[in-house]
């Protein structure tokens, strides 16, 4: 049913890919409204080439292209990595963490353009629709949201490609490579197509950021990453901006085949889906961050922060970045990171990265005089007996009761 007249102007989160290329034309035909395209540069690289021209060719009146790379890494990726947030123990949340920033900027443009509506290209089965729309409502509780995938009858990749061909819309997708991808400075994700068979191995030519571990260099490479207050600030002694630092780690990790993950994850909407991810720089960063934390954080503080990881990661995955509980958790996590100052030395080799050295000039809690296995005068080993007996009390009581009652 036509919606013409209900909206005069809409701002579309535009990627130039299959869905959003078609949505520009569809919005004009279905709603009869002016369409303003917005493309967020969060590290897609050449994927953004020609975006303004493509948007205008398909009917958009304007196209904003905003360079958000530094803000993305500084204000979204780094805070998340202070929490060591990994969803279900595998997914580094590369797509999830980009959506709040894209939505934030999209809403700023909608306000400046006096647009009544915002629009996204997320499907009605996925998580992104939730992530976008929760953020939209955070910034404007009364905003009108248009989600074409929940309205139109173009319900498959094949039908979308046919629609595009019919209307002369160029799209960078062919039937030979039908899977979809989403790329930013933190990762690239792949889903759909051959990946919908959970038994099928991803084709090697799908990967874009990393070489196969089998084809990686035969010689390991070492990298030193410095952290201040839980954030990385330099690589091998060279200070870099947040976006530069992550981009450099992506190059190093990709060269050594680091950061590939093939995951069957649980979507917020209730279904399982398969995603294949490349997160080379993020994988190195998480390992290095852990290394510095281990030498600088108090045991109980570390355990407390780690207990929050599943909840924090799930909030980001489900789209609750702007929720008060995430902000409260972030404040606590950031407090724990004030002592995370130091350097981790990481070994990169054939798909693996591991910390092989860590140090902190200002916040190390490691005391070699206490930890040594050699003779020392700091630690009286006889004291351990009472400590053990006290901690064993509940176990001894339980054992005695079991014997008493058979």
From Swiss-Prot:
EC class (word): ligase
Organism domain of life: Bacteria
Annotated binding of L-aspartate, by residue: 123, 127-128
EC number of this enzyme: 6.3.4.5
Annotated residues for binding of ATP: 13-21, 40, 121
Subcellular location(s) per record: Cytoplasm
Binding site for L-citrulline: 91, 96, 127, 131, 180, 189, 265, 277
GO molecular function: argininosuccinate synthase activity; ATP binding
Keywords attached to this entry: Amino-acid biosynthesis, Arginine biosynthesis, ATP-binding, Cytoplasm, Ligase, Nucleotide-binding
Main location: cytoplasm
GO annotation, biological process: argininosuccinate metabolic process; L-arginine biosynthetic process; urea cycle
InterPro entries: Arginosuc_syn_C, Arginosuc_syn_N, Arginosuc_synth, Arginosuc_synth_CS, Arginosuc_synth_type_1_subfam, AS_cat/multimer_dom_body, Rossmann-like_a/b/a_fold
Keyword Amino-acid biosynthesis: yes
Catalytic reaction equation(s): L-citrulline + L-aspartate + ATP = 2-(N(omega)-L-arginino)succinate + AMP + diphosphate + H(+)
Pathway: Amino-acid biosynthesis; L-arginine biosynthesis; L-arginine from L-ornithine and carbamoyl phosphate: step 2/3
Family the UniProt entry places it in: Belongs to the argininosuccinate synthase family. Type 1 subfamily.
Protein name: Argininosuccinate synthase
The species this protein was found in: Syntrophotalea carbinolica (strain DSM 2380 / NBRC 103641 / GraBd1) (Pelobacter carbinolicus)
Gene name tied to this protein: argG
